[in-house]
């Protein structure tokens, strides 16, 4: 733990005061959470801070996703807090989600006094044990003198290498105990990234230069390398595909962009990948939703795999060249060795496959249809807008259709696929980016998972617009049951219809039901232009499907639908 030098006189802090002091020195300006008995000492100290604003969520899961929205847009750790017991367990889903999507979070929870741990005390659960499999690292701070090192290590770990959540569980007596410090800890910084060999760079460059049909495959791990990713793609004329987490790394309309691959990617993209003789995989983990049946994915392609996480190299597909390193550092060394090539024959084959398997966007100009609504919303904002989604059909329709053109524009739950992510993540994005419009695409099933956070958006007058596609159903469940289960649809449609307009109005949101508007596009433009939170409601037919689709367990070439 680095220190900022010896103070003129030792300073005395309670554990709670030190936590807040460290957060201030770390540059944290917003914390979100819900207080409870076991963390009240921290909240008492937080109330005295003139630097940190506290956002009171309506549910701890909401607090976790609010923190995610901040971390995803800013690229640095964000902080959420809760009490022990139910407060901590309510955070679990948001923290697990952050782990799978590599989002840097610091989760601080209160715990019963250290002497009472293991006695089934009031609101005691084994937070440390619960959080082991869903965090990058976790701590149970049993003594006050451990706290400075733990806080420093937690922030360093959360943002170093492959980012992820770190959980700090602090017993109440540690929060109230005192510590005297001669030196104050400096803000924690990232650890240096792994070094890599010049030989691996030369080998990768030789493979790229020799390839006839190379494809650049981007995952979420390229988030900090947009300039060099584009430089590599354009210099080597590499058709480029992106996972759900990487959308926006190349603008949607870029001539080299193939868009998203996998389960709901373009049919042409999945067939183009099968023709590749080389995959240059940057910051991606060969997720099953992206590659389908593993043994049938790009069977004739050699693989260059660059990832900061050694565990991902060779886990699913065996690479011919594996480089554990920061993607941007690798590209800085690799690009000078790359030959500029037109690759005209390869681009002609790509164009032929795109013509043979054109993207079908039905009713793309009708704002009362799913794709048309997405296009209409996009026409109301510029590229500064931040897009969040919940999880379901609306998520995939938005991924397919929205013109995502920059990194950190697109926030969605990829690995865990968490319904209820969208609204609180949008709140976090709006808090961290007060000058940006934030658009949250949601479905009726997902919105109900964290609908209480409408209150948080309203109380803070955040410029969050919820675009609700309401089909009175769990759309993706309905779709899979309709297509793949002999007994048809069961427990996927709701027997009643909720009046979301009244609910939103009750929370203080502006509202607009496009189905009742004479000019839906004009109404959409007007409500998005107005500042403050709003709900935009549109009815969607429950029989609508997300096409094309790779059936579960199938190869990417076995897509069904339009």
Regions found by a protein language model. Name each.
Residues 4-5, 109-150, 246-349:
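Glycine-rich, acidic loop regions that bind phosphate or pyrophosphate groups
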Residues 16-19, 34-37, 42-46, 351-430, ...:
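Active-site diphosphate/adenylate-binding microenvironment
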Residues 72, 220-304, 405-436, 449-451, ...:
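Glycine-rich, anion-gripping cofactor-binding loops and their flanking helix/strand elements
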């Amino acid at each position: 733990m680095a220190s900022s030098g010896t103070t003129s006189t030792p300073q005395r802090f309670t554990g709670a005061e030190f936590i807040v002091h460290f957060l201030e020195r770390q540059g944290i300006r917003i914390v979100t959470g819900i207080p409870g008995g076991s963390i009240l000492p921290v909240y008492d100290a937080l109330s005295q801070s003139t630097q940190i604003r506290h956002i009171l969520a309506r549910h701890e899961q909401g607090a976790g996703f609010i923190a995610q929205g901040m971390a995803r847009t800013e690229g640095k750790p964000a902080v959420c807090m809760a009490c022990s017991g139910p407060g901590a367990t309510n955070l679990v889903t948001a923290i697990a989600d952050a782990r799978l999507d590599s989002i840097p979070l610091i989760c601080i929870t209160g715990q019963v006094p250290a002497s009472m741990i293991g006695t089934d005390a009031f609101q005691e659960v084994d937070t440390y044990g619960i959080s082991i499999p869903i965090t990058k690292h976790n701590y149970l701070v049993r003594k006050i003198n451990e706290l400075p090192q733990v806080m420093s290590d937690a922030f360093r770990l959360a943002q170093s290498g492959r980012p992820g959540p770190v959980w700090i569980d602090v017993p109440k007596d540690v929060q109230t105990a005192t510590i005297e410090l001669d030196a104050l800890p400096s803000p924690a910084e990232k650890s240096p990234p792994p070094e890599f060999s010049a030989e691996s760079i030369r080998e990768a460059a030789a493979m790229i230069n020799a390839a006839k049909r190379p494809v650049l495959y981007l995952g979420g791990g390229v988030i900090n390398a947009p300039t060099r990713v584009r430089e590599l793609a354009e210099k080597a004329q590499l058709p480029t595909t992106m996972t759900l987490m990487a959308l926006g790394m190349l603008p949607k309309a870029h001539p080299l962009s193939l868009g998203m691959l996998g389960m709901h990617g373009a049919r042409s993209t999945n067939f183009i990948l099968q023709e590749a003789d080389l995959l240059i995989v940057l910051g991606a983990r060969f997720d099953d939703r992206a590659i389908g049946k593993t043994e049938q994915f790009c069977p004739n392609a050699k693989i260059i795999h660059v990832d900061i996480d050694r565990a991902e190299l060779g886990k699913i597909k065996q690479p011919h060249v594996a480089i554990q390193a920061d993607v941007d550092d690798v590209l800085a060394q690799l690009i000078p060795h790359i030959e500029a090539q037109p690759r005209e024959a390869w681009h002609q084959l790509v164009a032929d496959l795109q013509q043979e398997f054109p993207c079908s966007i039905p009713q793309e100009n009708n704002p009362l249809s799913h794709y048309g609504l997405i296009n209409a919303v996009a026409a109301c904002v510029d590229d500064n807008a931040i897009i969040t989604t919940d999880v379901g059909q609306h998520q995939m329709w938005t991924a397919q259709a929205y013109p995502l053109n920059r990194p950190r524009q697109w926030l969605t739950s990829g690995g865990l696929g968490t319904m209820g992510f969208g609204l609180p993540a949008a709140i976090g994005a709006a808090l961290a980016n007060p000058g940006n419009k934030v658009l949250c695409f949601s479905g009726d099933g997902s919105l109900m998972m964290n609908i209480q956070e409408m209150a948080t958006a309203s109380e803070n007058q955040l410029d969050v617009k919820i675009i609700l596609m309401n089909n009175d159903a769990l759309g993706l469940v309905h779709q899979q049951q309709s297509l793949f289960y002999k007994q048809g649809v069961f427990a996927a449609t709701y027997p009643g219809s909720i009046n979301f307009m009244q609910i939103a109005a009750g929370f203080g949101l502006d509202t607009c039901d496009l189905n009742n508007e004479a000019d839906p596009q004009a109404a959409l433009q007007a409500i998005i232009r107005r500042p403050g939170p709003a709900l935009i409601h549109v009815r969607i037919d429950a029989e609508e499907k997300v096409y094309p689709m790779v059936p579960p367990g199938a190869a990417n070439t076995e897509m069904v639908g339009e």
